[in-house]
Structure formats: structure tokens, C-alpha cells
A protein has these predicted regions:
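Outer-membrane beta-barrel translocator/receptor signature
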Residues: 1-55, 62-69, 80
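Outer-membrane beta-barrel strand-turn architecture
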Residues: 31-36, 75-79, 126-130, 174-176
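Transmembrane beta-strands of outer-membrane beta-barrel proteins
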Residues: 4-8, 37-41, 83-85, 133-139, ...
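Short, intrinsically disordered, charge-balanced linker/junction segments flanking boundaries
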Residues: 1, 147-149, 167-176
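Hydrophobic, lipid-facing positions within transmembrane beta-strands of outer-membrane proteins
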Residues: 4-6, 22-26, 67-71, 116-122, ...
């Protein structure tokens, strides 16, 4: 971020008088007067009930509930160095099919996913030779927790689960 700012937005929509969808989002940036530190934040929320366009009991648009949040911050300990930190998270639930009041394996057909994703990492930058050269040392990690059901005909074995952790680290030198 390079300046202080704040924004909030919200929408509410309706599909053919049947289903409501809500969205709320916000962004903020805060920067010190000498630009030695700053942070940018974002958030969003979206919610939609399932939509059955032709009244056959099956959704054309599935149920959706999503929350996201993230930030990027920096601190300049000296004129020629910067420490940055990022963090992002997503929590999302989606479900399509029919009989939404029942468990997924009790329906005729269900496609359902639930994701919780967390990621982030630090970076350290050092600038040399009047900013013509830069050395960056960085790391990041992401954890994904996913539960799913892709089943038909009341299949109790259609559930899936994934847990994954990924990490990356490295260094990069750039010179002009």
C-alpha cells in the first residue's frame, strides 16, 4: 500500500424471485507517514441459497457460503531493506443436487465441497547499489483441508477428505 484508504461494498440480489444472494466486501490500507511500515487488508463474504430454475427438485446453482480474509504488511527497518508478511484464508462451502435438508448420502444426488485454506509467508528484501540490485529471501506455506461428497443414489461411500500442506522457500537475486 502507498496511501491510507478504506472501502466497504455490499450487494443483495434475487434470482427470479426465488433465491437471495448476499455479498459484503471490505478493503483497508494503512501506511505510516514516512512509508516505513504499512498493511493492506481485505475481507469478503458471500452467501447464496440453492436455485432450482425449472422446479424439478434439483439445483441449477448450488448453495454457497464463502468467507475470505487476507493481509499484506511490510516494515522497512532501514532505507535499503524491507520485511513483508502475507496471510490469506478461504473458508468455502458449496452444495448442489437435491434434498438439501438431508445429509449428502441420503439424497438422490449431491455434489458438495467444504474447503478451509490458510496460506502465508514472509519475505526479506535487501537493496544494493542505489536500488539497482535486490536480494530476496522468502518462504511460504499453504494448508488445505477439504471435505467432499460426489454421490448418487444414497451412496454412503462417496465422501472424500484431503489434508495437504505445501511449503516453499528460496532466494532470488536481481541486478540491472
Amino acid at each position: 500500500p502507498v496511501s491510507n484508504s478504506f472501502q466497504v461494498s455490499s450487494t443483495m440480489s434475487n434470482l427470479n424471485g426465488k433465491v437471495w444472494e448476499q455479498y459484503v466486501g471490505a478493503n483497508a490500507s494503512l501506511v505510516s507517514s514516512d512509508n516505513s511500515y504499512g498493511i493492506a487488508l481485505y475481507q469478503s463474504y458471500r452467501n447464496r441459497n440453492p436455485y432450482d430454475a425449472d422446479n424439478d427438485g434439483f439445483s441449477e446453482l448450488g448453495k454457497l457460503n464463502m468467507n475470505t480474509f487476507g493481509l499484506r504488511s511490510y516494515y522497512r527497518p532501514t532505507q535499503f531493506s524491507r520485511i513483508s508478511l502475507e496471510y490469506h484464508t478461504t473458508n468455502e462451502f458449496r452444495r448442489g443436487g437435491n434434498k438439501f435438508d438431508l445429509q449428502p448420502h441420503e439424497t438422490d444426488i449431491t455434489e458438495q465441497t467444504k474447503h478451509i485454506i490458510n496460506s502465508g509467508g514472509p519475505t526479506y528484501d535487501v537493496f544494493f547499489n542505489e536500488y539497482r540490485h535486490k536480494l530476496s529471501v522468502y518462504g511460504s506455506a499453504q494448508h488445505t483441508d477439504r471435505n467432499s461428497d460426489y454421490g448418487a443414489d444414497k451412496n454412503a461411500n462417496a465422501y472424500g477428505k484431503t489434508k495437504d500442506l505445501t511449503a516453499v522457500g528460496g532466494a532470488m537475486y536481481v541486478g540491472n
